[in-house]
Amino acid sequence: MKLTTKKQLMARYTILFAIISLIVFYLFYKNGVTFIWGAKGQDGLSQHINALMYWGEYIRNFFFNIIHGHFRFPMWDMSIGFGADILGTLNYYAIGDPLNLIYVFSNKSNIELLYNFMLVFRLYLAGVAFIAFGHYLKKDGNGILAGSIVYIFSGTFFSFAIRHPFFLNPMIYLPLLLMGVEKIYRKEKPYLFILMVTVAAISNFYFFYMLTVAAVVYALIRFPEYKEAGFFRTLGRFSGWYPVSYTHLRAHETEADL
């Protein structure tokens, strides 16, 4: 089995991604169609765009207040429905996703461009995460490359993620979360596992639940490979790092409330 370096894989993947993206998305460009799903008032236009623009303004106001000596972190907004918790409401729209910080630069004139760019960029990152996982497992380079393309240009993307861009987030997180599982099995540092659990939890609670189930199933499938390495000690590690991530999240929520 011939192993390919990360740089070679990334270069080949980037070129292949660009070619396939041009083929897949050309009709959108040719017909002047945006990725925003909203011709008949669907979620893209009625919810996602509004949530992202709100988030961008929220971040700008937060830094504006800090610059002017007022440390304010609003947690409630009466303009959301009949009044709602800001972070709790926006969590559904993956506002906790670090990539959404780019919307601090959003306004009415560039929001469509940012929205379209971030959808394609997330798709690209999902393939990068798949490649990182495959390379970590020392799989064949051609197999990794083929798998990454099949993974991202799948039915999930064309049926759901192209309408709801944050559906791409679990496609980015899953390979990295599974890599974290492998690292714990191999008695390596658990930092990647903790990081991915934390990011998944703050991004979207629905997908966090699904990713947790996937990680457990994967850990059980991989168990025969590592059963001689002390199963109960390894199980204890998995059980321990999830609460660590949760405690970290709760600490930040408490600070925000104060």
Which residues fall in each region the model found?
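Membrane-interface transmembrane helices that cradle and orient dolichyl/undecaprenyl
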Residues: 177-192
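Membrane-interface alpha helices of multi-pass inner-membrane proteins
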Residues: 191-205
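Conserved small/polar residues in nucleotide/adenosyl-binding loops
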Residues: 247-254
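Membrane-interface coil-to-helix junctions
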Residues: 22-127, 149, 153-171
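Hydrophobic core segments of transmembrane alpha-helices in multi-pass, intramembrane catalytic enzymes
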Residues: 123, 166-178, 210-218
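Transmembrane-helix signature of polytopic, membrane-embedded enzymes
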Residues: 130-153
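Start-transfer (signal-anchor) and selected internal transmembrane alpha helices
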Residues: 1-31, 237-242
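Perimembrane helix-loop-helix junctions
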Residues: 211-243
